[in-house]
Amino acid sequence: MIMRFGYVSHAMALWDCSPAKTMTFTSFQKLSKQEREDKLYDVTRQNLEHTIRILHYNIAHEIPLYRLSSSIVPLATHPEVEFDYIGLFTPLWRKIGALIKEHNLRVSFHPNQFTLFTSDKPHITTNAITDMTYHYKVLDAIGIADSSYINIHVGGAYGNKEKAVERFHENIKKLPAHIKRQMTLENDDKTYTTAETLSICQKEKIPFVFDYHHHMANLCEEPLEELLPAIFETWAHTNILPKVHISSPKSKKEFRAHAEYIDLEFIKPFLHVAKKVNHNFDIMIESKQKDLAMLQFIHELSAIRGIKRINSSTLQW
């Protein structure tokens, strides 16, 4: 069983390299037309250049997974902001794409919790489609739209989970088919359990990104030993490895909050279940210390008898 690792957005080991520098709409409004254009251009350019720097860092450390920042373009989906964030930066998008393709990196997006399809309010669904379209346009500009995924949660229950799931199945029909093909769903830590999310994924033929921390915070009756093979099976039609999210609780009191690093003892039960399935898969580390937490976790795992470190960020068990 091969396990490849990656992390989210910021490389903590790099100085002043945020790929998510932003500006608020309030500050945007205070500027003149030219100042607005200049500020949007400068911040986006810096975010793209920092992303390129991070990708070089990942390549040097043999890190095959990376989640791009959704904030790479400030105010990209704001209805009162017009900005040609694709055309103005074509060379930089292409440079990012060239690095990803040359080094066979797996990158993804994870929009925020407001991008959902369970609401009974039409404008929420419209906003979700706008946000998914923005993420897809960026992947397309990079040249990887047909091989990269945009991951979201199912959404809220709004007092009636059954009705909310019905709305999800109806509202998702409004999302263009080419974008839906690049969509994944993740179980959350309060509302939709692993089993419930799996059922939706199976009906919609959407790959399931399993989050173990969320699963432990929002348990279902079905044992993980039964669920995990079915979760991995949702990826079968993609020819891409299943991906899981790993983090551990900040404390018993703040169980849902992410700790700075990974607690190996918390993760071990999942790893033993995964070993029984014995299917190659990718792991996205969601700890606060990002790449540093990932490298420390890999180091700790590689010390376990039977686990072999193939390279900096890949293990065999």
From Swiss-Prot:
Documented EC number(s): 3.-.-.-
Q: Which UniProt keywords apply?
A: DNA damage, DNA excision, DNA repair, Endonuclease, Hydrolase, Nuclease
Give the enzyme class. hydrolase
An example GO BP is: pyrimidine dimer repair
Under the heading Pfam families, the entry gives:
UvdE
Please give the positions of the paired cysteines in each disulfide bond: none
Query: Which molecular function term from Gene Ontology is one that the record holds?
Result: endonuclease activity
Matching NCBIfam families: uvde
Q: What family is this? A: Belongs to the uve1/UvsE family.
Role: Component in a DNA repair pathway. Removal of UV LIGHT damaged nucleotides. Recognizes pyrimidine dimers and cleave a phosphodiester bond immediately 5' to the lesion.
Name-wise, this protein is: UV DNA damage endonuclease
Q: Which organism is it from?
A: Bacillus cereus (strain ATCC 10987 / NRS 248)
Lineage at the top is: Bacteria, Bacillati, Bacillota, Bacilli, Bacillales
* Name of the gene: uvsE
